[in-house]
Amino acid sequence: MAWTIILFFFAFAYAMFQGGFVSWFVFYSFLPIILYTLAVSFYPLSDIEMTREIDKEELYADEPLDVTIEVSRRFLFPLLYLVIEDHTPENIVKRNSNLKKVASKGVFSFGFKKRLTFHYTIDGMPRGDYRFKSVTVKTGDIFGFVQKSKTFDIEQSVLVYPKIIPPQKWTPLDLSFGGRHRSKKHFEYDLTSISSIRDYIPGDRLSWLDWKATARTSKLVTKQFEYPINKDIMVVLDRTINPDDKNGERFERAVSLAASLTDRALRTGSSVGFISIGPQAVWVGMQDQSYQKWVILHHLAAVEPNGEADPSYAFNKYVGQMSHETTVVFITTKISSKMVLLFNDLISRGLAIEMFLAIGDRVPSAEDALLQRLMSMGVYIHLVRDWRFDEILKAGGSRATS
C-alpha cells in the first residue's frame, strides 16, 4: 500500500514539474490503477463466504475423494484474481508415497461474479482418519502492490477404512471335538436345531432361508441355528514395529488382510472377535452381527504400527476369555521365539492357530527356522507377499501345515 502512494505522488510531481502532454498522459494512465489498488485495499474479505463439500465422509482405501469448494459474496466488486487453497491433511501424502502433492490450490478470474466453484479430486485415498481444517483465499491488484488473504476455519472429518479384498477361497479352520482336527470344510450347522430367525446377511445359503417368515414380513429372513460348527474366530493384529518394514507397506497389507478376513468370516456366519496388540491393546468381544464389522473397521482405519513389546505379553491376558472352539487368526509382519512359545501354549489349550505373515521378497533366515518350528507344531502358515490375497490360498500356494 505504501508503494502505491509513493508512486502516485511521484507521477503527480513529475507531471507538475515537467508539464506537457506526455507527463500528464503518464499520470492519468496510471490513475485508474492507483484507484483500483486503493479500492482493493479497502475491500473487506469478510464479504466472502466459503463452504466445503466432501462427497463421502467414509470410504475405503484407494477410492477417490471428491472435494468441492463454493465461494459466494454480496458485493459486486471486480476482483482480477482469486486464489483458493484448501489445506488438506499433510499425512495424506505421507501415508501414500505413490500419491503426488494434492492439487488443492487454484487460481481463478473472479471479476464481477458473485459465486465460484472449485473442484478437485484426491485419487487413491490412503487408509487413515483425516481432518480438513481450513481454506485460505488470496487476492490483490494486478501488480501485487496490495495482497490480501483470509483463512476460513471449516473443519470436516474423513475416515478411510482399509481396503477389503475378499479372499473367496478362505474358510477358517474346522474344529472337531477336542480342538485338534483341521480341514478346509465350509461352515456347517446342525440344520435340525433352529433356535430363531434373523434378517438375511449376504453370504447366507439359500437353504437357510425361512420362506414362510420371508413371505409374511416381505423381506428375506434366515433361520438361526443353535449349534454352529466353526463359530468363533478371533482375529489378532500385531502392531509391533518392524524395522525392516521401512515404508509401512507390509503393515498396510496386514491391516487390509485383517479387515478382509473379518468381512469374510462374518459373511459366512461366524462369530468374530478382534484383538489389536500395541502399546494399548484393544479387545472386541465375539459377535456375529453385521455391525461387528464396522466396530473393527473403525479401529483399523486409524491404527498405526507403534508396538514395542513382544505381542505375546499382551495376548496372554486374553487367552482365558477364549473357548476351546476358537480359531485364532494371527496377522503379523514378523515372528519371534516368544511367539512360538505362545502358539505352543494355545495349541495345548485346544485352540487352532492360523497365521498370516506379511513379508517382503523373501523370508529372513532367522524367521525361516521359526516358521519350520511352527509348522511342526501344526500351525497353518500363510506367507503374504503381495495384495493378491486369494493367491495365497490356492492349491499349491503359500499355505503350509504339518
Describe the role of every protein-language-model region:
Residues M1-Y43, N306-S402:
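Von Willebrand factor type A / integrin I
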Residues W24, P32-G285, T327-I331, D345, ...:
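An amphipathic, basic-hydrophobic helix/alpha-beta surface used to engage anionic
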Residues H87, Y200, H299, V303, ...:
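Residues that form generic nucleotide/phosphate-binding pockets
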Residues R253-S256, V295, A369:
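Generic recognition of stable, solvent-exposed alpha-helical segments in well-folded globular domains
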Residues V282-Y313:
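Short, charged loop segments at secondary-structure junctions
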